[in-house]
Amino acid sequence: SVFHVMKTFVVIGLGRFGSAVATELSSLGHEVLAVDEREDHVQRVAEKVTHAVTGDARDPSVLRALGVRNYDCAVVAVGDDIGNSALITLNLKEIGVKRVICKAQSHVHRKVLEKIGADRVVFPEHEMGVKLAQGLSSSNVLNFIELSEDFGIVETAVPKEWHYETIQNLDVRARYKVNIIAVRRGKDGALNVAPGASYVIEPGDAVVALGRTEDINHLQDL
């Protein structure tokens, strides 16, 4: 993950998304400078991050004074106004911040940000919505992680016909074109990573499977 390699972050815009990113990065042990023009937003995270400052990031002199150039990565969480987030992104790139990650609200917004040099653009609301919909559409699914458009990892309850079968007998790879990478015993049980061929599936188990999205969907429908 990009966040593990880098150690110092500037987070600009402390709405729900920005403040969540700032506090989480801080709790993971990174140095975080949090910036917002609203004093109440800054106060909300002040105790939880390394530095919290009230300032207008649209003004390049403010960013220079804060020394943002010395940070590994900037997260622009000002998603509601294309003009503001574009201007801030441009400022950061011109000042020389190595990596700039931006939040966008739409595909048009994303295109604008990529054109002016954003290294990565995320759609938090859209991504959460997609994950929620995938979870709701299958009552079996406990968790779904999209690795790319075509591949994913899913944790799903095992179908009845798998009970008391060994992983070898199930031959999941040949039958369903997915790989079982772990099994969780019982609802809150321990995760058995890379279970052996002789592992017996029991009622209440959940499997963590890796594969193409279409094959994973088929597995969930069992």
What label would you give each PLM region?
Residues 1-222:
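Cytosolic regulatory regions of ion transport systems
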